[in-house]
Amino acid sequence: MNRIKAVVLDLGNVLVFHDDLVLFQRLSAWGGAAPEHIRKRMLELWDAINRGSLAGDELRRAVCRVAGSEVPMDAEAFYALWNCHFRVHHEILPTVDALFGRVKVILLTNVNEMHWRFVRPLIAQFERFDDLVISCDLRLAKPDPEIFQATLARSTLRPEETAYFDDVPRYIEVARALGIQARVFTTAPTFRTQLAELGVVV
């Protein structure tokens, strides 16, 4: 097995938890559309949101329409509601701390500008990451292989020397097809075990 030189981490449900049902329920309470209706309609929007092609006031108006209102809430209220469903996954952070100095630590995430602006200050460790690969900045999003290739290229990494952790199996499959040592993330203890199996003992 090749020695792992970099660990690439997803954001949602790895470093932070995000309960989309909470978001949809809050949007429902504000706009009147049913949470399930909101969930289904948002499925049509997430790719554009993650790629940054739907952003800012346009994003706010689109989400408010999905919630059932042609009149959008004001920007400050929307920002608070749009970020209501995040909480830091504190249990994983000591393991992340232990990776610094051993391997490169990189973030690769599908995220929009407003979510990233809210989440980034919550985790001080981001200041120590070797790279932060943000989908809306690149105008690329998982599962597009290009965003994985861009992540490798930006840090001059070989895929076989790169470990990648994500909670979405479909993204793991794409990464593996590119030769990346990808694993489905489930829990912090399992993450430590997976690292050890890859030769990264922390």
Predicted regions and their residues:
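Asp-based, Mg2+/Mn2+-dependent phosphohydrolase catalytic module
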Residues: 1-5, 9, 112-113, 117-202
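N-terminal helical cap/lid subdomain that shapes the substrate entry/recognition surface
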Residues: 2-93, 101, 112-116
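Short amphipathic alpha-helical segments and helix-helix/interface helices
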Residues: 93-97, 172
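Anion (oxyanion) recognition and catalysis
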Residues: 99-100, 176
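Proline-centered loop/turn at the N-terminus of a beta-strand
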Residues: 104-106, 181
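Conserved phosphate-coupling serine/threonine residues in phosphotransfer and NTP-handling enzymes
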Residues: 109
